[in-house]
């Protein structure tokens, strides 16, 4: 709305137009060249370019290096396997994005298709995208407002701005007000002058906020950190090994070949694919619970969320007005008040207030009685008189009216005592978040104030329990709404969220005036239970402030106004019946109404996270174990403990069965979880070095007691690395003793056992290597599993020292 009220002539002068003739066609064309089309610009990326982008990032480079190294040393089987892993990772990511609706496209579709415009003195229908500032347009009931329009002629409009501002009730507009692009006309008809089009509209600025909202997931950061750690470690160790071997006079070609194979084994090429598949399977589980995952990394983000910002209207509440406790006055009964109000309502108008009153009449069994009355004349609500009125006949004739309490008091010529009483009631209702409606009846030659009907948007039936469960999961829930503070406080109290509700608009004014600093603003936002009088840019700011305080933030919403914050949040959740724009901006889309399904989604996300963390610890442990053992054997003993072929077989047999980790049974964490890289790397390194010790011990046993040849020793060590490696996953999969519940899933257990058996047959029978026989193979089974118990003890000591749950 204008800060200074302008008259029609001033507005015409401002926009160089006339409400009598509109713009000329030529002038409209000129302005179209200046301002562009009234639409949301669409940034299109060719699908091939988008697909190739999945192979141009640090994670992909890591895998591509491994593939190139494999090709250089002509290990074609390894080369093909790595390429498959690379493609799996790329295809999963591309398909996930391809299926997800484009945010900008949906926001564009939200724009009105056609508009009634006055050009060259004639009214005509044109595509809404051709509107320009200064155009004179006509909007009426049922229209989607095609641009930001200054209303200059007509009685009034009632528009639904809930998808834009979050206000639960339609808003009244009069001359001088602005009807915003994307809002829906519920009542009335007015003429206006186009103020802004496209991205310059209030709606368009929302799009800019969506485009501005960019985020890098903690999953991506974790992958890069682990990749950097392992690659740097591998490069340093391999460089030392190559230097020492060349100093010893070994063949450059032979040394380089082994070094390249070792480098390939050190790069966790399968890690992104395994983690993507784990998240994809988790996404399927969530889909069964009516939560559609659009971006796989959102699962990992949701597991770590510690603050949930929930939109109020339609998410925590029904977005449907209902009547509170009826207050009857002047000797009238509650039934009388509802009867009079119902007679002053029309069902066919589908007005939110009228529907609430008629529903209350149905509850009180008054509908049959109402049918006996005949409405002779009905005066609908308008912003000028602020009430409805009906002339009614039955056995007698009388009038009824409902509207703003102050207006009804004036209609009744109420005395001071009644006015004071009604005003006290209205003030008390307002403090508790209710809107008040006055009701009067005209009998015996005068109007009588019959009573007051409180109205409010009630919480969903499932909301209080959902809020309680979310809190039990260690997640703080904050309510966000465009409604006034009193309404927000009432709903927050009813839901058990808390009553520390602040007006974000007032807080931002203080920030702008310099009364508080940015740090203080962020602190107040962090401590608040909820926010009232919120606009789209405010929601974005709220999420940003919480993120700056170190929180992982989830945001639920259903309207266009929620889209920027949904995109900015670590995990954006579009609830059931959300607008296309909200769905497009979100990471997760709920199909069931309310937020109860979020409880299931958080629990499932945490289970998925546990599986991912187990695999990450396992993968780092194995890389360290093999790298250090091979390196030290070469440097200290001058022996290659395994061949290049064995390293390739290890890579295949170790990673393929571990895909089953996606189906493993896990303990659900009771609080938000995050990638604790320090703890993960310390635990992995300790278990990896323990594996190095156990490998040297078996090396010693083989040489001193078993007197194996070098070829047999290599086969023996190969079997040890496979069996002990697979035993590691049983150690890392649970933060308790490995024999405690939950037990491994059947798929994981038999997947591991199957590859263990294959590895045993290969070593015992001498396939691709020297045979060691079944006696030594069985001995190795016993040795590997005894050491598994030792590793489990090391794990428990470290978990206690590092205070990891």
Swiss-Prot record:
Entry EC no(s): 7.2.2.-
Family to which this protein belongs: Belongs to the cation transport ATPase (P-type) (TC 3.A.3) family. Type IIIA subfamily.
CDD domains noted in UniProt: P-type_ATPase_H
Pfam families: Cation_ATPase_N, E1-E2_ATPase, Hydrolase
UniProt-listed SUPFAM superfamilies: Calcium ATPase, transduction domain A, Calcium ATPase, transmembrane domain M, HAD-like, Metal cation-transporting ATPase, ATP-binding domain N
Catalytic activity: ATP + H2O = ADP + phosphate + H(+)
Descriptive protein name: Putative cation-transporting ATPase MJ1226
Native source species: Methanocaldococcus jannaschii (strain ATCC 43067 / DSM 2661 / JAL-1 / JCM 10045 / NBRC 100440) (Methanococcus jannaschii)
EC supergroup of this enzyme: translocase
Cross-referenced SMART domains: Cation_ATPase_N (SM00831)
Signal peptide residues on this chain, from the entry's feature table: none
Keywords: ATP-binding, Cell membrane, Membrane, Nucleotide-binding, Phosphoprotein, Translocase, Transmembrane, Transmembrane helix
Residues passing through the membrane, by range: 53-73, 75-95, 226-246, 258-278, 615-637, 641-663, 680-700, 712-734, 747-769, 773-790
Gene Ontology biological process terms, A to Z: monoatomic ion transmembrane transport; proton export across plasma membrane
Its membrane topology: Multi-pass membrane protein
